[in-house]
């Protein structure tokens, strides 16, 4: 049965590439079964057959480059083997536990796939590892250090330090928005980025705006099993994005604070004043709380005259939206690439 699924998936991908970019129909059906959870192994089971096996061709990869004082402050750089320099740079900041590589069953190419897509589309890719911090803005400081590393070093990897774009997903939105929204975290060249894509953002601090409660909680659901899938035995760090890397700092600086302090920590004023162009995107199968917050964020920015590009990815889930890049399905990457090219 599994072979049959992927036989039709490959056919569908080919058809989508020739006609209209979309989630392959069989995979779209399976994603509905998988549901609105953080279903990494289940979604990787569907998408891994559509990706090449490493080692990859046509790309130079440097892994685990240090960008900060913590041993976990590392990033990967993907650049083309051939071709010129001064390319736009895509800095990817993942969701979940912040891992730049998922690992686990079928997880070996995620999120190399985002980097490979970037290189194939004329960019240099940088994949950042996230980790917890001791202060409320500790993870945001890490984002700032990664941006500064890119600004200072990416020219030697064929990148243009003046055209750096951040693509962040899920939990990665929290430290990214804090970095952009607080100029005291910026480096000597200012914010250091040309644009930011907030993909499937969970609620972050945009006080005084407060997202209304979603009926029934609206959070992530349980994961259904796609056809032919057998769940692996549970292991630590199974890629489901629970635990240490939720994008907020940990330790004594993270605890409960009074209302005035919380308001002062709001990202909204700084997001508005930064003048950085934003794209906000959600998946059709994202849970209601994600979609609700994204729409509120869009509205607050628009009220301030800072309307963001807003996209909903049809048939995609919270996880498939980041596993589909570098396949024939360009329903996610097409709008992203168009937006990047539109930013002057």
Language model feature labels by segment:
Residues 279-281, 285-298, 302-344:
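C-terminal catalytic histidine-bearing segment of alpha/beta-hydrolase fold enzymes
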Residues 83-87, 96-137:
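Short substrate-entry loop that stabilizes the transition state in hydrolases
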Residues 23-85:
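N-terminal cap/lid segment of alpha/beta-hydrolase-fold proteins
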Residues 93, 199, 313-316:
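Alpha/beta-hydrolase
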Residues 91-95, 282:
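The conserved beta1-alpha1 loop
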Residues 49-57, 193-194, 198-270, 276:
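Mobile cap/lid helix-loop segments that gate and shape the active-site cleft of serine hydrolases
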Residues 148-217, 224, 229-234:
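Primarily recognizes the serine-hydrolase "nucleophile elbow" in alpha/beta-hydrolase
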Residues 8-17:
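Bacterial N-terminal signal peptides
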């Amino acid at each position: 049965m599994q072979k049959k699924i992927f036989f039709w998936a490959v056919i569908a991908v080919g058809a989508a590439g020739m006609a209209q970019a979309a989630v392959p129909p069989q995979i779209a059906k399976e994603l509905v079964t998988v549901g609105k959870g953080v279903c990494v192994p289940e979604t990787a089971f569907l998408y891994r057959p559509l990706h090449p096996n490493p080692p990859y061709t046509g790309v130079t990869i440097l892994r685990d480059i240090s960008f900060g004082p913590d041993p976990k402050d590392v990033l990967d750089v993907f650049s083309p083997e051939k071709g010129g320099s001064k390319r736009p740079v895509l800095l990817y900041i993942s969701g979940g536990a912040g891992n730049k590589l998922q690992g686990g069953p079928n997880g070996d190419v995620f999120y190399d796939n985002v980097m490979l897509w970037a290189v194939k589309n004329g960019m240099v890719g940088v994949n950042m590892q996230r980790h917890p911090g001791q202060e409320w803005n500790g993870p945001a400081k890490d984002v700032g250090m990664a941006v500064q590393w890119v600004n200072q070093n990416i020219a030697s990897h064929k990148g243009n330090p003046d055209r750096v774009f951040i693509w962040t997903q899920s939990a990665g939105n929290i430290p990214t928005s804090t970095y952009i929204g607080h100029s005291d975290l910026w480096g000597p060249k200012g914010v250091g980025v040309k644009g930011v894509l907030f993909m499937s953002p969970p609620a972050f601090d945009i006080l005084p705006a407060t997202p209304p409660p979603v009926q029934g909680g609206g959070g992530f659901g349980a994961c259904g099993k796609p056809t032919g899938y057998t769940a692996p035995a549970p292991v630590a760090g199974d890629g489901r994005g629970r635990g240490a890397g939720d994008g907020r700092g940990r330790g004594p600086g993270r605890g409960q604070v009074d209302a005035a302090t919380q308001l002062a920590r709001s990202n909204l004023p700084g997001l508005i004043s930064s003048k950085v162009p934003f794209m906000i995107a959600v998946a059709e199968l994202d849970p209601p709380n994600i979609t609700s917050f994204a729409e509120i964020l869009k509205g607050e920015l628009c009220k301030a005259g800072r309307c963001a590009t807003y996209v909903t990815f049809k048939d995609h889930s919270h996880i498939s939206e980041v596993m589909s890049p570098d396949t024939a399905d360009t329903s996610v990457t097409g709008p992203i690439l168009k937006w990047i090219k539109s930013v002057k």
